[in-house]
Amino acid sequence: MNNPSTTKAPLADYLAHLPLAEEERERLGESASFSELHARLAGAEGAAADAGGDPALASVRARLQLGTPELDDAEMFGVDAQGRTFLKISPPIRRTKVIPEPWRTNILVRGWRRLTGRSNPPKPKRALPRARWQRVGSLRRFILLLLMLAQTSVATYYMKGILPYQGWAFVDLEELAQQSLLDTVQQVLPYVIQFGILALFAILFCWVSAGFWTALMGFWELLTGRDRYRISGSSAGSEPIAADARTAIVMPICNEDVPRVFAGLRATVESMAATGEMERFDFFVLSDTNDPDIAVAEQQAWLELCRETKGFGKIFYRRRRRRVKRKSGNIDDFCRRWGGDYRYMVVMDADSVMSGDCLAKLVRLMEANPEAGIIQTAPKASGMDTLYARMQQFATRVYGPLFTAGLHFWQLGESHYWGHNAIIRMQPFIDHCALAPLPGKGSFAGAILSHDFVEAALMRRAGWGVWIAYDLDGSYEELPPNLLDELKRDRRWCHGNLMNFRLFLVKGMHPVHRAVFLTGVMSYLSAPLWFFFLVLSTALLAVHQLMEPQYFLEPRQLFPIWPQWHPEKAIALFSTTLTLLFLPKLLSVMLIWAKGAKGFGGVIRVTLSMLLEMFFSVLLAPVRMLFHTRFVLAAFLGWSVQWNSPQRDDDATPWSEAIRRHGMQTLLGIAWTLLVAWLNPRFLWWLSPIVGSLILSIPVSVISSRVKLGLRARDEKLFLIPEEYDTPRELRATDEYTYENRWHALKDGFLKAAVDPLLNALACAMGTARHNRAQAIETVRGERIGKAIDKGPEQLDGATRLALLSDPVALSRLHTRVWEEDRDDWLGRWRKAEADDPHAASVPLAQVVPGDAGLLPAAQS
């Protein structure tokens, strides 16, 4: 036992950080040791835990009751098999089998298995009942294919007439074999380059054509409002939700911005409660966080959220200790533990906000459409202040509805799922949508990265519809704040979409979802195709300027084959391509003119914003092209692309990072400009949008990431969106709660979980590694605690921190040793962290009584 004279000082400090009445603080201050203090705090309830040599663990419940008395009223305390207190942060587990079907991606293997009598996976027992919308959808997609092919054929024919070398038919292969290699190269090279240009042009034009017709039909849908196949029209929107139609709203997170995540979740919870349908919904925060400081911040944020919304027993938290299969594995784990308790599941992202009306409407739509497996909303982007993000918000808000409505027009009930802000029918998802790793080795094998498209394809293969409710309000998300953060996300999406293409020929996939896999690939593969198209165009210019033209391509040819140039055809084709690219944007703005532009700043402001956004999109397109080309090559070649961006409070891109990321692009733009100027300066007029963008990439990336410019644009009503003009209640609440959460955001989470009396009690009660007593476990615990004591909080590695955080016994023993031994490396660092935090509670803490607003209700310093 410690000497009382050496214990009093830290003992008084410890008690000062507990919200006690003054008389109780004096009584506990008479304790001769920390063990006695915890025994007095625990009373008879903690005897079992204390008998095991864990005095701090014995007082966990008492300390939590002091800080959060609402826990008792909500019956949140439980006792495990060893008599240790825990919080009921998740419902009782009722396990459901989640078994992924192995992928058979090789059609030759499938054919061999059929020949040898071994069965391939059977077709699903359930078939989607044949409905009129399926016939209509098939007819529409056939028409779309004809339109794309016809448009591409005409454009390719024009392109062929524009290219200078028209004598390929006169090339005699037999003669080529008899002449020198140099003569053959000089004669054939221009035609080979032209063929490559023509092939790439046809592919790229077809891709642009698909987007054009999608936007055009979306414009028609939104203009007329006569979509008889709208999924949102199948429910009146006010019918009561059945008592057994329970819905889990799940939010998978991983090392996220905790104040923003829980602010958005609180706004969603409160909006849901306002509908009067809260009894049908439960909320789950599914954490894959592996940063100990963030994990502790999540625990405290969960407790505060439950207390502020009276959500104990309705809002749950689970942090995985074994992170497998990333987000899809996180969802699988939820389905395996609790999926059988719910009929539906709504998946939200960390930056998602959804209104209660939207959530209730989704459930009603599912109830009204028993053949629907997934209903995807069209989230509206909002909430960002940088110039880049505001331009992207404006673009997605103005142009996005056309493309989303167009997707619905062509796909109907065989549509997309984007992985968040969507409702899923739980049982078929569990039965059919678990994802096995892709077989083989290399960068395109292993756990599937972009799970959403694959899950939609599996849901449709199982006989369930996948719909987009493109006109459903109340669904929101946030966009990356700057170009480099967007590209960081694109790198992951690029690899995931390329992996998904391995499933293109998997048995049973619907043709629409095979097309979805193809379009997912083209979203990124179009970048290297465009880059190679530009490279070949430059190469053709070099051949035309540097090589002596071959006018006579066969013996006894009477008339020369002159290189041709038709500027009128080139201008016509160029104008047509620009029309396909930019007409959808103009149609979007025309639709706003027709329906009212007040929410976008008025007719003049929305038009000016469109023109500015078009200018910036032209500037940024070549930059994205080079990055996406790099991502595609890295995926195919198995390169590991490291991208560790620094943390930035204002989301601005530093000049140093912009130079590092865009420097090679700038040099390429300068070199390309000099080369073309040397070959033929007149060609620079055609290439200037490309090389000019690359040369300016550094300042454009930096300047567009500035918050001040974004706020100034908002003040001028540029890039204004309706969610800013008349902000929905949920978004206003999210901003308010984010500000409040940042004001008292928890820093140095693990340090405080190990030292602070209240946070240690919370972390111990939420620890999930609840082992039985065993000598091997005790040995490992002792090693971890000894390592933590020896190294101190700053030198302790992350893996040991996580292990201690998950083990309530080890964490409580570390807490006890730090205070009993008066460890200055821990206590001194903790006191400094408290002193450096201007929003930390003053000590001594006043006693908390039910109804108080905060966890630490003392006056703020």
Curated annotation (Swiss-Prot):
Biochemical pathway: Glycan metabolism; osmoregulated periplasmic glucan (OPG) biosynthesis
A family per Pfam: Glycos_transf_2
UniProt family annotation: Belongs to the glycosyltransferase 2 family. OpgH subfamily.
Function: Involved in the biosynthesis of osmoregulated periplasmic glucans (OPGs).
Primary location class: membrane
Species annotation: Pseudomonas aeruginosa (strain ATCC 15692 / DSM 22644 / CIP 104116 / JCM 14847 / LMG 12228 / 1C / PRS 101 / PAO1)
Cross-referenced HAMAP family: MdoH_OpgH (MF_01072)
UniProt GO BP: glucan biosynthetic process
Membrane association type: Multi-pass membrane protein
Gene3D superfamilies: Spore Coat Polysaccharide Biosynthesis Protein SpsA, Chain A
Protein's UniProt keywords contain Cell membrane: yes
UniProt-annotated location(s): Cell inner membrane
SUPFAM superfamilies: Nucleotide-diphospho-sugar transferases
Keyword line: Cell inner membrane, Cell membrane, Glycosyltransferase, Membrane, Transferase, Transmembrane, Transmembrane helix
Full protein name: Glucans biosynthesis glucosyltransferase H
InterPro entries: Glucans_biosynth_gluTrFase_H, Glyco_trans_2-like, Glycosyltr_2/OpgH_subfam, Nucleotide-diphossugar_trans
GO function term, MF aspect, one: hexosyltransferase activity
Enzyme Commission number, as recorded: 2.4.1.-
Listed transmembrane segments: 142-159, 198-220, 521-543, 572-594, 601-623, 683-705
GO CC terms of this entry: plasma membrane
